[in-house]
Regions:
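Structural motif corresponding to the early beta-alpha repeats
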Residues: 28, 32-120, 170, 224-229, ...
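Histidine-acidic metal/acid-base catalytic patches
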Residues: 1-4, 11-26, 53, 57-60, ...
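Conserved phosphate-coordination/catalytic loops
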Residues: 9, 43-47, 79-83, 116, ...
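Surface-exposed loop and edge beta-strand positions of immunoglobulin-like domains
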Residues: 6-8, 139
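Active-site acidic/histidine proton-transfer and metal-coordination neighborhood
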Residues: 16-17, 58-59, 74-164, 173, ...
Length: 283
């Protein structure tokens, strides 16, 4: 396996510091949060992008993905959405990152309408992304939290420049088992975001292995050589433990899981309070 972590866990941290932490703790990659609060985002000047790329290369760390906030299934005109997608693609290309994360964001819309928006926009933007050596990844999130929902869109898009990002928290919260998520996402998958929490009611981030998410079952499905990216949501939970002190423990936990490639026999969904159990599927 290859391991990365998201800079969402290091709000506002300079690129050099994030790269040094990754190298020090054995992570090959970083997922960069592309927001104006952070050092790198779509409005960052070209010279700063070049400097960041050189800093990362000197540390031996690659940019796995650029985590953007474009909502491809949301209502509204296509023009601003497509322009924002192109800006993220250019940022990723400048940083030599293979992926750009996008959100669905279709909450409040009928499912068919949200799907249609996402399909139309991803179809339009995917060739541009592919031409820059980048792939747009629709995250399992908000209006499309399951592998089934993301795949429903991506099956219709049908282009190499669009794929999926499996956020294991949201598929679990939606009641989807890891095997079900993998079945639907595997043909489209870019990489997997892992994390851990205490329960479905308490989403404060924990170090990997300290919570209830079925990370053993998730990693059992990911093929050798795939990327696992730890998204520790410190930005949204400022009272959570600082990430740097957890990086070694988190990576060691993923390494242990990756060495055991078989899922536990007889594992089934339990209550949200049970280790590894998923919340009951909504009616």
């Amino acid at each position: 396996m290859k391991y990365a972590f998201s800079t969402l866990g290091l709000p506002g941290t300079p690129v050099a510091r994030s790269a040094a932490l990754a190298a020090e703790h054995g992570y090959e990659g970083l997922e960069l949060r592309a927001h104006t609060e952070e050092p790198l985002h779509p409005d960052t000047p070209g010279g700063e992008r070049v400097a960041a790329r050189r800093t990362l290369a000197a540390a031996g760390v690659t940019v796995l993905g650029v985590a953007g906030y474009v909502e491809v299934a949301a209502s509204g005109d296509d023009g601003p959405v497509l322009a924002a997608l192109r800006s993220l693609v250019r940022l990723a290309a400048d940083l030599e990152a293979p992926y750009v994360r996008v959100f669905p964001g279709g909450g409040g819309l009928p499912e068919a309408d949200a799907d249609a928006h996402a399909v139309r926009r991803l179809r339009a933007a995917a060739p541009y992304a592919e031409g820059h050596g980048v792939r747009l990844l629709l995250e399992t999130h908000d209006s499309h939290p399951t592998g089934a929902a993301a795949a429903r869109v991506l099956d219709r898009v049908g282009q190499a420049g669009a794929g999926a990002l499996w956020d294991v928290l949201h598929t679990w919260l939606a009641g989807e088992q890891p095997g079900e998520s993998w079945r639907d996402l595997a043909p489209h998958l870019g990489y997997v975001q892992v994390k851990d929490v205490a329960s479905a009611q308490d989403l404060t981030p924990l170090t990997l292995g300290a919570g209830v998410l079925p990370l053993d079952e998730v990693t059992a499905h990911v093929p050798s050589g795939g990327w696992l990216c730890w998204e520790y949501e410190k930005r949204w939970y400022p009272g959570a433990e600082e990430l740097p002190g957890q990086l070694t423990r988190g990576r060691e936990h993923l390494v242990r899981l990756s060495r055991d490639r078989s899922a536990p026999a007889g594992r089934s969904a339990g209550s949200p309070g049970e280790p590894g159990g998923a919340p009951p599927r909504p009616p």
